Amino acid sequence: MLCFLSISVAAESLKNERILIITSYNPDTEKTNANLKEFFKEYERLTGYTANICIENMNCKNLSEGMQWKDRMAKLLENHKATPPNLIILLGQEAWASFLSQTSDMARKTPSMGAMIGTNAIEAPKEKDINLRTFMPNSSEYPSFTNFNIVGGIFYKYDVERNIELIRKFYPNTKNIAFLSDFTLGGLTLQALVRKTMEEKYKDLNLILLDGRRSTVFEVCTQIQKLPPHTALLLGTWRIDSSDNYVLANTTGPISKAAPNVPAFSLSSIGM
């Protein structure tokens, strides 16, 4: 899915604005590159000018290095202190969460936008020695971050409630929801949203976490095979397992075949 940022202010005034784009991943990665191309194309169409745009890269890899991201973001912002931007655009969940953990005036007061992110977010942990494999953060919707000057963006809406209702419509005897997530910030953010929704609205259902932060793809397969009766599988994300290795497409096959009689629904575009 391409995120398209449409700018509808006077073209001449845009030329005088400094725009800082901070990406979670290398700008050459497919999704990031596609989003940047669309932004530059539209911006140049409106202004005929792109020299006022600067791109920084957090070079995030996996969640095991997540405790470094807050400081990494702070250093990137510090690099632009002499000539502060008029707008900061964050591409990716890692950049977004790291930005929302900042306390500087630049981060809090500069107009900011997000893309390639969900409407829900988690803040990076304040403790330096926290174990990210067991960290259970709270989920917040982006409008709740009132101490930041968030002016807009492109957000994915993950509707957990409608998915649960769909599961109950097809399988009214469902007693357990098994949620699959991986060892990425996106996986942890989705898991936090699912936990929050289940705790607030579905206390009659039992939530089973198939957590890639602590399980390999093969361990998850075993867990799926041992799921109790009346369980539905809700798919979140699956790119990196507990071994810190990216999961290849041919390794997701065993998950989909682990228990073919267990009904499966997808919260994201994972599909499997």
Question: Whereabouts are the PLM-identified features?
Answer:
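Bacterial N-terminal signal peptides
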Residues: M1-S6
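Short hydrophobic alpha-helices and adjacent helix-cap/hinge residues
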Residues: V9-M272
